[in-house]
């Protein structure tokens, strides 16, 4: 077949090199090999996140604003906050009346467990009428959980939060001073929801005696009490669905080992280059159930690359193709 550029790659983990003998030798970027692999590590198709998120908040004072702070309209409220935080003696009435301080809300979101001594970044927002908190000094502020327990202490220099495009400020020095109830639950979240795949992962975890529960087509909740177990889970090998990659432009077909084609009958008009014969010769092809790479090898001498691709696409449309069909152009000039 003159212009046929046919590549059959069967991926069965350790047999990759051997099965590549069925290829025409076209150089293809290794990333395509990886994309067709039927065995991947869990961390390649999913992320692991703690199930718990701790929200800590507190009301504090930013000082050193040099006339950019709150007006004296809320003087009584500011004094009350200073007294609650035991810093009333650090702030003189002159600072309140000269707009050098501002009443602020400090908030912190901690994903996972709050660990004593750990350092975090918090958001700071003006509560009253201060317009600019840049380079102010957040005085010691208690951050509490929803139960009212003091979990962290915040203080430091306020800086604009560029991620919020000019609105809001941050501080970098929030120290957790109390451990909360330690939670060992995590969610494995697939990058693309798939009930078959999520159930496959569930069975593997169960076989390894790892407590887990399917929550949706993309999420499994697990229990992991140490980092080493999380590392083991990240590196679990998962068998994914077979894949078939087709490059129509270059006439390339890549099929993973377990991709299969079912039984059906296909009618196609073959282009006949003999001028003495009919230019359009309709041919009926009986396709029997077999592995896709076997089907292509069996018919590569009788069918063109275009015809093979037509048959594969037709099989997909009538649910006779076991595998995910990917249409993509491959650069065969890569080394």
Swiss-Prot record:
Leader sequence segment: 1-17
Primary residence: periplasm
Subunit note: The basal body constitutes a major portion of the flagellar organelle and consists of four rings (L,P,S, and M) mounted on a central rod.
Transmembrane regions: none
NCBIfam families the UniProt entry points to: PRK12706.1
Reported function: Assembles around the rod to form the L-ring and probably protects the motor/basal body from shearing forces during rotation.
One GO cellular component term: bacterial-type flagellum basal body, distal rod, P ring
Taxonomic superkingdom: Bacteria
Record protein name field: Flagellar P-ring protein
Family: Belongs to the FlgI family.
GO biological-process terms attached to the record: bacterial-type flagellum-dependent cell motility
UniProt gene name: flgI
Keywords: Bacterial flagellum, Periplasm, Signal
An example molecular function term from Gene Ontology annotations: structural molecule activity
Pfam families xref list: FlgI
InterPro entries documented for this protein: Flag_FlgI
The keyword Signal appears for this protein: yes
Localisation: Periplasm; Bacterial flagellum basal body
